[in-house]
Amino acid sequence: MIGKVVVSVASILLIVGVAIGVVAYINKNGDANLSPQMKAVRGICEATSDKASCVKTLEPVKSDDPNKLIKAFMLATRDAITQSSNFTGKTEGNLGSGISPNNKAVLDYCKKVFMYALEDLSTIVEEMGEDLNQIGSKIDQLKQWLTGVYNYQTDCLDDIEEDDLRKTIGEGIASSKILTSNAIDIFHTVVSAMAKLNLKVEDFKNMTGGIFAPSDKGAAPVNKGTPPVADDSPVADPDGPARRLLEDIDETGIPTWVSGADRKLMTKAGRGSNDGGARIRATFVVAKDGSGQFKTVQQAVNACPEKNPGRCIIHIKAGIYREQVIIPKKKNNIFMFGDGARKTVISYNRSVKLSPGTTTSLSGTVQVESEGFMAKWIGFKNTAGPMGHQAVAIRVNGDRAVIFNCRFDGYQDTLYVNNGRQFYRNIVVSGTVDFIFGKSATVIQNSLIVVRKGNKGQFNTVTADGNEKGLAMKIGIVLQNCRIVPDKKLAAERLIVESYLGRPWKKFSTTVIINSEIGDVIRPEGWKIWDGESFHKSCRYVEYNNRGPGAITNRRVNWVKIARSAAEVNDFTVANWLGPINWIQEANVPVTLGL
């Protein structure tokens, strides 16, 4: 059937979200004697994780208009996070001068991330406006920000090492976590409702509130591809369009959803001073020999403008930069490129075990708090060693991160993919325990995963995803067309040291391995439980079409899914897992979605 289907967001909310919720509520409770206001409230709250809290929050709102109810819920969530932030500050004050360096560091970090959460919630409320008909294709971006708001709160708790303090803060911020969780559920219901009607968010016309019927084009096929090749550089790419993993990857290896201007930057920023530095004009140049504007990377970051609509381009010339680099939240759209991942190296030694006043989040050699970060031909290293325990090489908290041809070297917690949507291609990442971990939607393609030798008696786990809410949040790690191999120092003991593809850090941990070569360094069981927890019973672990001695699945744990068809992993392709791409459409840049 050809033709337009015109329907507003509010209509979807009211007809599908609210109506289905009310029917479900009435069927369950047998009570049809509800006021219009309570019908709307019960309908909206039916899909939330904590219905009682949701209803209690919305009961005082004297309206049955979904626009006003959902807006009121967001404002209540913002108020709750303000209270959580105040509670954290008060707790730090109550500890007085006797507070330990680690507790002070983590509480200061908590105050910072609560500030980030409040900023994002204020943006959400502003973007929502007074009429939900106007949010159109913003729905998924709002949901992405809400996911970040939730993650900021869990970041605070995850970084607290002391049990008593974690319990105190956990109880103090419980209300804001519940409200944020419910807010995510409400937005998830909206998106799911549109899916039930076979409508797509990106089809919304913001000015009219209407949408077109969805395209009938099929999903891009998943190709087996070829394994990457390890050398002194990051992993070599397969040649030619016939070997593209997805229709969303062009002949340069860059996703088509990256804007035209950024694609040019990625293409021009080649390895070596005779290639990259000469081909694009950097905003700032960093050089240890004084030939640039700055001698440290942090100085260049500090010089970049805040809330930049364009790109701040930093060329880091060859050299080892022994510094910790922090990119604040307002320093968005920074693009760093070096002269080679082994030539331009940012290195630092900071760890939870050996550095007083350090948390996992604060241990990162490079810490990216901002959106739109890009990097190419740079090495990121934490030199704390296995005795340092958690020691992050890079932590990326910002949405829309794109990283190519880089190295990440460390031991425990090397690559912290902690928030937003992140895409990595042709990287090398090495480590021991949970060395690719976080709470983001991340795809790593055509990369070399190197399992290292840690402390005596220590096991290795490649991944540790932190999804706490399941399908309502798009959080999970995807490794596609990668190679998983032992480091040279581990090779002789690779069959003795226990190494696994991952373990579930949180209740709904999500990790997918697709079209990858898995060496015999990985044990036949494949995956490990998180000691003391039952997260393996609810996690979502999937393997599809892998190869190599470590990919044999007949002895796998019984809680991993072995997919037999491409359709079973289609949700985890770049197009689906890192989309929708409305954030590029809103920026009015060229984008190719399909063929």
Swiss-Prot record:
InterPro entries: Invertase/methylesterase_inhib (IPR035513), Pectin_lyas_fold (IPR012334), Pectin_lyase_fold/virulence (IPR011050), Pectinesterase_Asp_AS (IPR033131), Pectinesterase_cat (IPR000070), Pectinesterase_inhib_dom (IPR006501), Pectinesterase_Tyr_AS (IPR018040). The active site is at residues 413, 434. Residues 227-239 have a biased composition (Low complexity). It is found in: Cell membrane; Secreted, Cell wall; Golgi apparatus membrane. A motif (RKLM cleavage motif) lies at residues 263-266. One of its GO terms (molecular function) is pectinesterase activity. It catalyses: [(1->4)-alpha-D-galacturonosyl methyl ester](n) + n H2O = [(1->4)-alpha-D-galacturonosyl](n) + n methanol + n H(+). Its main location: membrane. Disulfide bonds: none annotated. Interacts with SBT6.1. This is Pectinesterase 5. The gene is PME5.
